[in-house]
Structure formats: structure tokens, C-alpha cells
Amino acid sequence: EIYDRMVMDGHVHTPVASLAPDVFCVSMNGLSKSHRIAGFRVGWMVLSGPKHHVKGYIEGLNMLSNMRLCSNVLAQQVVQTSLGGHQSVDELLLPGGRIYEQRNFIYNAIQDIPGLSAVKPKAGLYIFPKIDRNMYRIDDDEQFVLNFLKQEKVLLVHGRGFNWQEPDHFRIVYLPRVDELAQIQEK
């Protein structure tokens, strides 16, 4: 649920656990995406649904949480304050907002490149373009992104890194500002 606050274009996030309340579900969330503090590993998990058949699992979680592997207490205290009140991410996801405009820019840039296509993201910080392999002879998406990194100094992630079966996709993070994304488009 880490992208639950990162939805755009009037879409609403639906928690997975709400789709089947009669099924035990472990949901995890945190601040790293919605508050744009990547690497700030503070988060939580919610156990929902019937728990009678997962008592051993819950006991294991409790045991783990009570071991010497304690959380960063100060960081955990930030969570409640961060989730209440004004949420600056909301403004970034509306028309005119930085993330919204960056998403639109990279989506349109991809559509303008012959042989590339993408579905416009409804949430998150990434776009997953598809490469027309009839136009571009790419048989190894990992080698493609490594070559692109070496030649153009732009970091992409190969699609098979996300369990995509065919070597015809890659991931772009659209967090850089539009002027930086425009430089990437030229490459």
C-alpha cells in the first residue's frame, strides 16, 4: 500500500484488504514514497481479516518485533504527525503539480518516440514503456539498460527485473524535474 497516497486524475486507491475482508491479509505501508523520503525506512504493517488460522504467524511477528531488532523509535514517532494535517503530496499530484506534470511529460515523450508505447500511470512514480521489438532488435533488456547507462548516463531498470517475461519493457522513474526529463528524451 506504499503508493496509496500517490494516485492522480481523480482515481482512488483501494486497499487490497478491503477486496476480501474474509481473507487474512498483511498490508504494509510507509512514508518513503508519499513523503518523498526515499531510503527513510519507517513503516508499519496491518493484519486484517480472520486471524484464527494464523496465530503462529502472528506469534512469530510479535517475537521478531520484541527482539533486539528494534525499530528506530524517533523515526516511528514521526509517523503519526506525518499522516495528519496538511499533506503536501496532494498538491504535487494535481494538474500543475510537479509530479503530475513530470508524469505527463514523460508519458507524452514516450508516445512521441517511434517504437515505444506506454500506459499512462494512474499512481506512483514510475512508467513502464514497451519496446516494439520489430522496430528495435532488443533480445536482452538487461543489456539494453546497461548499454544505455554506459552510453547516455541515464539509469533505467530492465523489465524482467520486475518479473516481466519478455525483454520488451523498461522502467523510468519520473521524479527528475521536467527540464531533466527533456534532456533524457533527447537521448
Question: Language-model segments: which ranges?
Answer:
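Conserved PLP phosphate-binding loop immediately N-terminal to the Schiff-base lysine helix
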Residues: 1-15
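Conserved core segment of the aminotransferase class I/II
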Residues: 18-97, 107-109
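Short, conserved active-site loop motifs that form the nucleotide-linked donor/cofactor pocket
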Residues: 25, 116, 154
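Residue-level recognition of strand-loop junctions within catalytic nucleotide-signaling folds
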Residues: 48, 84, 130-132, 175-177
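Conserved glycine-rich beta-strand-loop-beta hairpin in the small C-terminal domain of fold type I
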Residues: 76, 80, 96-110, 118-132, ...
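PLP-dependent enzyme catalytic core of the Aspartate aminotransferase-like
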Residues: 137-139, 147-156, 162-187
